[in-house]
């Protein structure tokens, strides 16, 4: 066997490999000999079929299987001998001339093929004992518990009919009957009866609610609005519509009394119990924010201390996924790059930097996990599946079946578990100081930070 490296540029390598026909033919004959006792052919006693006859019957298919196995084993030896860790699947280029292929399968021609790879660079890990990170912690105050309960009360506040002759104002709930038309023709889904709408909630298409301010009970108005260009129903998107709209009831929001009775409407036995439950929920929420801030700071330190050029193919794959998602989000929101005060080229440059960071950090975390034997157990994955199932009441079996039949989905569950375990490993070694902060500081967004 001859191996010639035809390309070595950075992390990219290409090899041309030549395997003698005699070597392949010997492997084919060995495999055929192993079939003698298993194959049953008319005219031959069990185990007495000559290899030459087996070769006539099964030679081509066995040769194809042998070639596939030989190429796989040869490539693996080449990569292992050179200490290569592949960034992605090797690209094998086989002969295309049919006569040459036939000759190889018949054991008369040497097999010559090429393989192109991109490898993961050697990664020198930092000394994590030198890392210093700050853990931001916020206590849940009584006022924050009360504010959270008040927000729930505001969302569930009762409404009462306004006095006769009163007009609708922002915040009022108006019950409507309407008929919609486009170019004078009614359209599916354009009519409704007894439809409640809180003015200012922006729950109808833009411009609809504004034209209802000041309407009275029994009053009819023709509301003229265009459907958004990114509207979900494509046959309506961007079209001008008219809605003949009548207000049948106008109600004003009432102050909710926050007491034991209010707590019971939420399924809690008393206001004190509601406060306990809210404090627990906020405590978990704050702990989650603390964890995210700490993790972000740690990833930033890993980014600063591990500078290397990651495999271009991995960065391209990550960028393509991100770019596709960005375009889908912008299209859904009906926005352009100009709306975000940037250009497409500037956005591409920025997101390619983020893709580079994500790939590098992923490789660093993987290296840390490998060197310190950090793994994700089946029990940990099962717990993650159970948690997903709990989030979808009534569909638990569907969730279990989905993960049982989708290895890719299971891998997506493993990835964040592995990442968190590696982060915990580093935090055990790093110097972590704790700082008390307010809720506002804990949840403050850091827009200048790159997405991790």
From Swiss-Prot:
Reaction(s) catalysed by this chain's protein: [protein]-peptidylproline (omega=180) = [protein]-peptidylproline (omega=0)
Source taxon at top rank: Bacteria
Record PROSITE patterns: FKBP_PPIASE
The entry's keywords: Cell cycle, Cell division, Chaperone, Cytoplasm, Isomerase, Rotamase
One GO cellular component, as annotated: cytoplasm
GO biological process, alphabetically ordered: 'de novo' cotranslational protein folding; cell division; chaperone-mediated protein folding; protein transport; protein unfolding
Annotated SUPFAM superfamilies: FKBP-like, Triger factor/SurA peptide-binding domain-like, Trigger factor ribosome-binding domain
Alphabetical list of InterPro entries matching this protein: PPIase_dom_sf, PPIase_FKBP_dom, Trig_fac, Trigger_fac_C, Trigger_fac_C_sf, Trigger_fac_ribosome-bd_bac, Trigger_fac_ribosome-bd_sf, Trigger_fact/SurA_dom_sf
One function term, GO molecular function aspect: protein folding chaperone
Enzyme Commission numbers on file: 5.2.1.8
PPIase FKBP-type domain span: 171-256
Localization of this protein: Cytoplasm
Keyword DNA-binding appears in the UniProt entry: no
Comment text on domains: Consists of 3 domains; the N-terminus binds the ribosome, the middle domain has PPIase activity, while the C-terminus has intrinsic chaperone activity on its own.
Job description of the protein: Involved in protein export. Acts as a chaperone by maintaining the newly synthesized protein in an open conformation. Functions as a peptidyl-prolyl cis-trans isomerase.
PANTHER family registered for this protein in UniProt: TRIGGER FACTOR CHAPERONE AND PEPTIDYL-PROLYL CIS/TRANS ISOMERASE (PTHR30560), TRIGGER FACTOR-LIKE PROTEIN TIG, CHLOROPLASTIC (PTHR30560:SF3)
Family: Belongs to the FKBP-type PPIase family. Tig subfamily.
HAMAP family on file: Trigger_factor_Tig
Protein name, entry field: Trigger factor
Natural source organism: Afipia carboxidovorans (strain ATCC 49405 / DSM 1227 / KCTC 32145 / OM5)
Gene behind the chain: tig
């Amino acid at each position: 066997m001859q191996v010639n490296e035809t390309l070595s540029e950075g992390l990219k390598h290409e090899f041309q490999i030549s395997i003698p026909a005699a070597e392949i033919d010997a492997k084919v004959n060995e495999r055929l000999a192993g079939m003698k006792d298993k194959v049953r052919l008319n005219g031959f006693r069990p185990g007495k079929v000559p290899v030459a006859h087996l070769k006539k019957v099964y030679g081509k298919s066995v040769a194809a299987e042998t070639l596939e196995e030989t190429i796989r084993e040869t490539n693996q030896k080449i990569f292992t001998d050179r200490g290569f860790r592949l960034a992605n699947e090797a690209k094998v280029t086989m002969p295309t001339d049919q006569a040459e292929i036939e000759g190889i399968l018949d054991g008369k021609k040497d097999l010559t093929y090429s393989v192109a790879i991109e490898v993961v660079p050697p990664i020198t890990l930092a000394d994590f004992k030198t890392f210093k990170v700050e853990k931001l912690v916020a206590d849940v105050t009584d006022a924050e518990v009360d504010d959270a309960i008040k927000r729930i009360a505001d969302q569930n506040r009762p409404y009462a009919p306004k006095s006769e002759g009163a007009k609708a104002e922002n915040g009022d709930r108006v019950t409507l009957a309407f008929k919609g038309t486009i170019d004078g023709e009614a359209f599916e889904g354009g009519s409704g009866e007894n439809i409640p709408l809180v003015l200012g909630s922006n729950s109808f298409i833009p411009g609809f609610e504004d034209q209802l301010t000041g309407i009275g009970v029994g009053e009819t108005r023709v509301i003229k609005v265009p459907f958004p260009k990114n509207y979900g129903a494509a046959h309506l998107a961007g079209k001008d519509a008219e809605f003949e709209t009548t207000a049948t009831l106008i109600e004003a929001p009432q102050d909710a009394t926050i007491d034991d009775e209010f707590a019971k409407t939420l399924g809690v036995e008393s206001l004190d119990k509601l406060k306990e439950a809210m404090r627990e929920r906020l405590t978990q929420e704050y702990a989650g924010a603390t964890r995210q801030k700490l993790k972000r700071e740690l990833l930033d330190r890993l980014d600063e201390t591990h500078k290397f050029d990651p495999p271009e193919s991995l960065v391209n794959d990550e960028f393509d996924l991100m770019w596709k998602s960005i375009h889908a989000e912008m299209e859904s929101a009906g926005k352009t790059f100009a709306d975000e005060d940037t250009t497409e080229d500037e956005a591409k440059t920025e997101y390619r930097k983020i893709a580079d960071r994500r790939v590098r950090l992923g490789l660093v975390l993987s290296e840390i996990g490998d060197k310190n034997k950090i793994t994700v157990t089946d029990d940990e994955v099962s717990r993650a599946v159970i948690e997903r199932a709990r989030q979808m009441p009534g569909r638990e079996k569907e969730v279990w079946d989905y993960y049982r039949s989708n290895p890719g989905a299971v891998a997506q569950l493993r990835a964040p578990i592995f990442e968190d375990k590696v982060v915990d490993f580093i935090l055990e070694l790093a110097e972590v100081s704790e700082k008390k902060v307010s809720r506002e500081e804990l949840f403050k967004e850091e827009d200048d930070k790159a997405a991790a």
